[in-house]
Amino acid sequence: MACQRDVIYWYDGTFEGFLCCVFESYANREIPWDIWYYATRQSSLFPGVDVQTDMVRAQRVLKSIREKLGQRVYYMVVRGFLNGDEGKEIRLLRFLRLMYDKGPQAAYQTGAPEVADVVQLARAVANEACQLKQFIRFEEREGMLGAVISPKHYVLPLLRTHFCDRMPNEDFLIYDNQHYVALVRRGEDVHYTRFQGGYLMSSPEEREHTYQRLWKAFYDALAIEERRNEKLRMQHCPKRFWENMTELKDLA
């Protein structure tokens, strides 16, 4: 039986590191007060435990989740971890402990706080990815298509398959300027590149500027002034996306 302890787990912020926190929790038969990653290190009244990332332990936990708890729980945990909200780690840990105690069917018990928390985390990530599939605007840069996004959550893994399937013959780069990671596709190679301190994309080609002017003119020409409804537009297309959209960036 695990007991609640006034201790904080420190980890490196990676998914593998989080899995090692799950391992640590079970090894010590305890539930920590919280789980923080090193980049947000701050003072606390509670003692801290540095949880080192061990790939062997991480793989053991991952294998256990998939084999004992099933794909639904696995995807809920993976998507929940992509969420950018603070405190996601302890909520995911409590969720996993409930699943191991009650079995994978407990994942459908959305009335349980542990389940509701993770459903909310995963849903927020999925919703933002769905929005970005609609709102991403590519520009021609240095012989390939480039786009910038500013998401709250780390959604690039959920955009990868969509855009690779949608543009099978195009080289492209999608840069997440909040997490400093780019999804890059060149030919058959698809990978992620992390940048320290950010990445400044090259300016669009001159031909691209011409196309953008034409697109803006077309967008404005379609508008019916009498039916303009700014509140409704922001409901369907939140303003935080506008700065990276060709037709709306001037209004952002």
What are these regions (language model features)?
Residues W36-C130:
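Charged, alpha-helical interface segments at or near domain boundaries
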Residues N169-D171, N177, A182-R186, L200-A252:
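Long, compositionally biased intrinsically disordered terminal regions
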Residues P32, Q71, Q131, F172-L173, ...:
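Intrinsically disordered or highly flexible coil/loop and linker segments, enriched in small
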Residues A2-M55:
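N-terminal ordered "arm"
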Residues P104-F195:
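Internal, well-folded beta-alpha domain core
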